[in-house]
Amino acid sequence: MQLKSLTLTDFRSFEQATFEFQPGMNLLVGINGVGKSSVLDALRIALSRVLPNFTACQDKRLNFEVDDIMMGRDQLAIDLKFQAFDIPFICNVTRGKSHKVEFKPDSENILYPLKNADEQPLVVYFSTRRSVPIEKVINEKSSEGNQSAAFAEALTHRMLRLREFADWWLVQEALLDEEAKFAQQRLEVMANVVTRFLDWCTNLRAVAKPKTTLLLDKNGETIDVKQLSDGERGLLALVLDLARRLCQANPNLEDPLENGKAVVLIDEIDLHLHPQWQRTIVEQLTQTFPNCQFIATTHSPLIIGEVKPPGLTLITKENNGIVVLQKRLQGFGLTSNRILEQLMGTASRNATTQAQINLVEYALEEGELELARNRLEELITMMKGYDDEASRLEASINNLEALAEEVDLENEMDSEEE
């Protein structure tokens, strides 16, 4: 399954906006409150209302609320174009006094066989609460063996339900005697995907006593998954949930991670991630799940620098409140400093430090080399050492001082000749 485009009309802060999506990773970038998460909400709610039409999904349809309609307007409209089972679909969802859905093609001759297909396309949403463990609410559907289990609450604001993962794992172990090949494959898929993303974590397993939970070995020590850091737990929740659902949706695929199809919506993909992980998360996700399409929000210049131009959309607001989309921007391969300054409109340095750099440069422009050196020394003291900019300024001062000495020497020689 792959989303092609989304048009929002009178939805929250969007009077009219069209988003185009590419295969692989798509990033939505913008300041807080500009509407990045709203785009994901529009997608997950609209898709929840049409997935049961052409997939094995039996989950509850989500609703747009009256508060989602732009102030002063009578209704909102969400228009979607996507492809599933190699069939192009068009979907229009409106919400005024009630919901209305138009979905094409709508022939049962086309749709009924799709609902019973051996391989089911998914849409999975990950909210900013994905790393928060919870054990109280258990969805029994998630451990069932049918394909509809893959869709269970996939578009809700789920927390990390370790008990559900553990229950599903224990069910797979119980199936080893009945369908050894596929059950073993599914368990290996889950264990391998953890090590692929967190290579210091191995031997993922479920235990039923003294209570049902997930354990793994971290640097050789056995711990409960709840004891991982927020960043580790959030990443684990994402890849385990997606991998499990791909296994459930495609029970006959030998490698559901390689060949399973899904649209994956991730709010704040950089959530709790160390900068080193932010630098690698895009490549890891797209290589591990090559047939999945990702649509994610982020504030991280490191992640922006890993996404090629077709997949980057910057959302901004003009003074009159109208939302503007800048598409196909270049972020791939740029330094974080350039991304901060050129794409995110943010200074790459502390304001006081930058002001001191400006003072050094002003003294250089005025030819006040002694003053420039004094101000440079103040800068180095302020930063507790050198960086590239301080080294550049020092080199400029040295060069100008050398040039000044050479000019003075030539003037002396000219004076002696006279």
Question: Where is each model-derived feature located?
Answer:
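Short polybasic amphipathic segments
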Residues: 6, 73-84, 90-92, 101, ...
